[in-house]
Each structure stands twice: as structure tokens, then as C-alpha cells.
Amino acid sequence: MSKPAFDYRNVLQNLPTLPGVYRMLDAAGKVLYVGKAIDLKRRVSSYFQKNDLSPRIQLMVRQIASIETTVTRSEAEALILENNLIKALAPRYNILFRDDKSYPYLMFSGHAFPQMAYYRGEPKKPNQYFGPYPNGYAVRESIQILQKVFRLRTCEDAVFANRSRPCLLYQIKRCSGPCVDHISKEEYAADVASAVAFLNGRQSELINELTRRMTAAAEAMAFEQAAELRDQIQALARVQEKQFVASNQSQQDCDVVAARVRDGVPCVNLVMIRGGRHLGDKSHFPIGGEADTEQEILEAFIGQHYQHAGVPAALVVNGVVDDALQQFLQERAGRKVYIVGNPIGERRVWLEMAEKNAELAILQRLGSKATQAQRLAQLNEVLELEDAGRFECFDISHTMGEATVASCVVYDKGAMQPTEYRRFNITTAAPGDDYAAMREVLSRRYGKLAEGEGRLPDAVFIDGGKGQVGVALEVLGELGLNLPIVGIAKGEERKPGLETLILPYLEKTLQLRQDHPALHLIQTVRDEAHRFAITGHRARRAKARTSSTLEDIPGIGAKRRQQLLTRFGGLRGVATASVDDLAQVEGISRTLAEKIYNALH
């Protein structure tokens, strides 16, 4: 190992033998690596005394110019600080998992007739939450089951408050119609309680209670109610056969965490068991960690994932969890957390499946990378570029010149990079002038990049024909940027696969066969630019139409506009309301109601 670029001996002799966190910095002051230690002096010294460091860490050590340390009261506290710093600083040589604070939940609102809904974000009172679930599909599947069995409402409160007759879900027996008083508050509350029991894993208890209620209804000759309860029992039995695991052990909430590294690709598969239900799994791929062991990958995932996610009663893992990590989990949970590193029986089966799922996810990732590499190589060949890997694509979206929005999407490192996408609200171009809109977005984007604020692409894709490409050439020329520009002109009848590529730097046009890998990559990037532009345009248009239509009326500000939209479930509801209906809204006088009605008709 080559000699470090700074006097590490002087640093080491002043380090304490206490627990804490250390940060390795390069000559520019950028953090290269963050680590924790029970003994800072011993741990940091090991980087300069060992000869068995991985190539990745050896490369990091050669760049160290300074070391900073923070002393903590315990190793568990050091672990928390380490993970917070890794999240905040994203050091190049750390294993970094993407933040999964946005795991979905199933929510029951705090309404008198609770709404059942899919929810992402921080839980809020007085709503009741179940989860988190590993993916959105698992939440939606649970909602469908609960709709079918317990017929709970899923509509927004504004819609619920303004219905005069039951909706389609009531007609197909997926809702009990509380909006039109087809079920009492007490009966609906009983259905919600049954759904909660189901989600908490009390299936046998729930079936016994429903059976008791069915018998009582039959004895009271309430045969219609008895038939509904019978249908619920049968539906629950079918779900139980499909989704629930059998052992008492499985009734405990549990996460199964399996780390695998294959061909330099690390992956962690997370399986969630809640209330006896197998909710599904999700594979996580860290940034970095290619040369790390499965044990290091496992520890990094647990430390980062449970910073925000709920900690279950038990974790089943395919490695060893040290005492500091277990203490951290228990402090997060506020109770004992069991770590099972050598499971038996059913849990062993779960762990083996998680390991297999991680390996399959790696194979898929490797296959995808190979496909992307092939597409990229073919793209470089047909565009006559050398090792180009970063592309930016621009598109313009508007409706008859209204609410024009431009998008810029980025393809890099063999994949789309959503965190680098940008939208631009076009303000200087005349409505419908796509050339002026393109000039504005390119000037704004590359004006900053030309000054060194960010990384330039290897080529620029323009969703448009010769006119748009001409504008791009002018703008980049004015900025002194010599970047290859590729125009993607829509083919005959705008059919995919018939696009013509305009290549001004080669002074030619090109039409690839429909199954050409390079064309597939171009279409992927172009379609993403189109999607990103049109979603931004629709949002801007909707906001403009809603705001201007109501707020242009004298006497209507933001607060009253929101009251009207909430009361009537949107602008369409306000437009169909009568003067009498409008006047019933708090703060809306009869005179103002007439003004609103006249403005919208």
C-alpha cells in the first residue's frame, strides 16, 4: 500500500480511546468516508497498519488529507450519528442505501365514518395506520380485500359529504353506503373494528365473532344480515388460506433481512410479516459496497433502514448483528427486539426465500446492466460518439399555448437519473411558440452549466425536428458550448419506431430499424422527457385554471377558494352548485354566492 498523503502518525497519537465517529476527508475537504468505533484510536489506526484492506478502501486511504472525530457516550450513540452523517453527506466510499421514509401504509382516517386509504408520509393523528408495507401493491391488495369483506369506504371526505346517492362501489358491493345513511355509525364502526382485527392477525377470533353475530341474526330472523355475515366469513376463510402462515411463531411481527453479494453487486432483500400476514418483499441495492462483505452490507442496511422505519418485534437475519446495533434497534422501538441469526422451522424457510430473492434480483440487475451496456454501445456506434454515457433530453408541453412547461431528463450510468430531472415554467415565450420555449429552457439550463455549475452531458437530445434543432445549435453556439445535438423527429403518423434522427454535427439524418437497440434507448429517454413535461404541464394548467377562475372573483381569496373546493369536492362541484348551496358555506354571503354563480355560468 502506498504511503498516505498526510502525517497520519501525528493524528493517531492524539486520538482518544473512546467510542465515537470518524470522518476521512480529502485535500478539498470533501468527506470520503464516515465510520464508527468503540475505540477511535484503535479503529482509525487499523487503516494505516493493515495490509489486507480491500482495493476500494486502499484507494480511499491514498486520498486522505485529514481526519475529524466526534466522541460519543456509547457505541450505540456512535451508530446513530454515523448513519445520520452517511445520509446527510453521502460519502463516496460508504455503503449508502436510498432513504425509504416513503414506505406506504394503509390508513383509517379519524372521520366518524373512517375512510380507508393508501398513504405515504409521516403518520398523523387522529388517523390509524397499518404497515409499513414493502410496496404499494401490498397496500392496494389489502384495501381490495377489506373492501370486499367489510365494504369500507375509500372516497375522499369532500366527496363523502356531498353525495346524494350511492356510488358504483355500493352497487357492486364494495362499499356499505355510509354517505347516504345506508348503514348506521355503530354498524360501520363494527366493520372497521373487524378490519382492524384482521390486519392485526386475529383471524380466528374474528371469524368466531362473525359466526356468533350471524347466528344471532338468523335467530332474530334478520336473514339478510345473516347472509351478509356468512359471505364475510367465507371471504375471510379464502383469504386466510391464501395469505396467512400457520405457526404461532409467525403471529409475531417480524422482518426477514438477507444480504447477498454476487459478481460485485450487493443486494438486501427485506420480507415483512405483520399480524401473521406475509406482506411481500422488496430488494434494495446500495450505492457503493461492491467490494464489501455480506456482513458489512447487512449491518449498513439495518442501521440506515431502521433510522426511520418501524422496528418489528423480531429480525431474522443471515448474519450477525452486534450488540451496538441491537441496542440501537431497541432504543428506536422502546422495547426488546429479538435478533434471530440461525432460525429454525418456518423462519428458516422465510430466510432461505429472502436469500433466493436477493440472488434473483442481482441476476435481473446484471441482465439489465448487460442490456443497457449493449444499447449504449450501439448508440455510440450509430451516433459516432466516443464513450458517451450521459445524455440530456428536452421536451415542451402545453395545451394550445397554455401553461407551457419544458422538461430536462438525464440518462447516466446506464439508467435514468430522476433526482437530476428539472422542469422549467416557460415565461418569456409567446403562447404556442415552441421555438422560443426551447430557446428559453436551453438558455436557462446551459447558461449555468457553461459557467461551471454542474456537469455537461456528452450529447443533447431534442424532441423535435429541424427547427428545434436549429434553435438548440444557436443557443449552445452563443454559450460557447460544442455539444453533439440529436434531434428526434416524429415519423409518419407519429408512430413509434419511425423516428428520424437529425445529426447536425455529422450533417446527416438517420432512420434506424424498429428493433435496433440504440433506437430503443433513444425512445426510452425521449418518452421519459415527454412524460415529465406533460405531468408538469397538467399540474400547472390545473393550478392556473382553479386559482384564476375563483380568485378572479372579487371577494374570493385563497382561504374562501379552499373552503369552496373542500365543500364541493373540486371546481366542477362549485360550478354545479346553486346559489343557495354556495351561500351555506361559511364566509359566503348571499350576495357573494350570486357573484360566484354568475362568474361560473
Swiss-Prot record:
InterPro entries: GIY-YIG_endonuc (IPR000305), GIY-YIG_endonuc_sf (IPR035901), GIY-YIG_UvrC_Cho (IPR047296), Hlx-hairpin-Hlx_DNA-bd_motif (IPR003583), RuvA_2-like (IPR010994), UVR_dom (IPR001943), UVR_dom_sf (IPR036876), UvrABC_protein_C (IPR050066). The keyword Metal-binding does not apply. GO terms for cellular component: cytoplasm; excinuclease repair complex. GO terms for molecular function: DNA binding; excinuclease ABC activity. Residues 17-95 form the GIY-YIG domain. HAMAP family: UvrC. Belongs to the UvrC family. This is UvrABC system protein C. It comes from Chromobacterium violaceum (strain ATCC 12472 / DSM 30191 / JCM 1249 / CCUG 213 / NBRC 12614 / NCIMB 9131 / NCTC 9757 / MK).
